[in-house]
Amino acid sequence: PDMIFHAFLIKYAEIAIKGKNRYIFEDALVDQIRHVLKEVDGEFSVVKERGRIYVYADSEFDYDETIEALKRVFGIFGICPTVVVEDKGYEELSKEVVAYVKEMYKDEPKTFKMDVRRAKKSYPMTSMEMNAQLGGDVLDSCPNMKVDVHEPHVMIHVEVRDKIYLYS
């Protein structure tokens, strides 16, 4: 991809893991991820954060090789290439989201739905307000995109934490 991804959000099955055993599973998964990434050119950090596992690229890396390595880890069911941006307020976030959509989907006609989650509750807008506002910003800037909240081609995820994570 042309876009510069700095991280990967790792999704894993949580169905059978509740309570005390969950951290054992997560720690084993983190160890396994670290192990497969040793074979990949590049430096990575693997971090558990509030029920998520992130793989951060700390150097240049081979995108395809990294994805292939992560696919070999048992227990992972999703690998989301993620753009991580500093939280510099709504205006900057909006610019980043619009740039992301333009880069990822060029001029292809697509329907989309925004999915904003705020782990950082101190953020001045609610998730609902951000969904509406960011969706409007994308519509204004990307004439090829249309909203479809029921069956969108694309879900554009924005997670507001200490930093902001964009993926789709």
For every predicted segment, state its role.
Residues 2-168:
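RNA-binding accessory domains that recognize and position tRNA/RNA substrates
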